[in-house]
């Protein structure tokens, strides 16, 4: 069950990343100063890393809950 939850969340993250890449490609033709583009990309990277860390934390929390449930049975 844990693996399927993790896989679902990972798939959602990948779909979100794909959507962001599409949006980024649509914005590229606009003339934007390089430092603004770099800042936006850095923020997107930080958000993606944060989301992955959250997924790992959630997976660990689910594992601990399952472990506690197994020990009490």
Curated annotation (Swiss-Prot):
Show the GO cellular component annotation of the record.
Answer: membrane
User: Where along the sequence do coiled-coil regions lie?
Assistant: none
- Determine the domain of life of the protein's source: Viruses
Q: Which residues cross the membrane?
A: 47-67
**Where does it reside?**
Membrane
Task: Name which cysteines form disulfide bonds.
Answer: none
tRNA-binding: is it a keyword of this entry?
Answer: no
Query: What does the record say about its membrane topology?
Result: Single-pass membrane protein
List the keywords (alphabetical): Membrane, Transmembrane, Transmembrane helix
InterPro entries per record? Protein_14_SARS-like
Q: Which Pfam families match?
A: bCoV_Orf14
Keyword field contains Transmembrane: yes
The role this protein plays is:
May induce apoptosis in cardiomyocytes when overexpressed ex-vivo.
Record-given protein name: Putative ORF9c protein
Species of origin reads Severe acute respiratory syndrome coronavirus 2
């Amino acid at each position: 069950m844990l693996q399927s939850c993790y896989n679902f969340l990972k798939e959602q993250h990948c779909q979100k990343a794909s959507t962001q890449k599409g949006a980024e490609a649509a914005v590229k033709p606009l003339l934007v100063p390089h430092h603004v583009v770099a800042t936006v990309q850095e923020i997107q990277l930080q958000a993606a890393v944060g989301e992955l860390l959250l997924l790992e934390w959630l997976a660990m929390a689910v594992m601990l809950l399952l472990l506690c449930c197994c020990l009490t049975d």
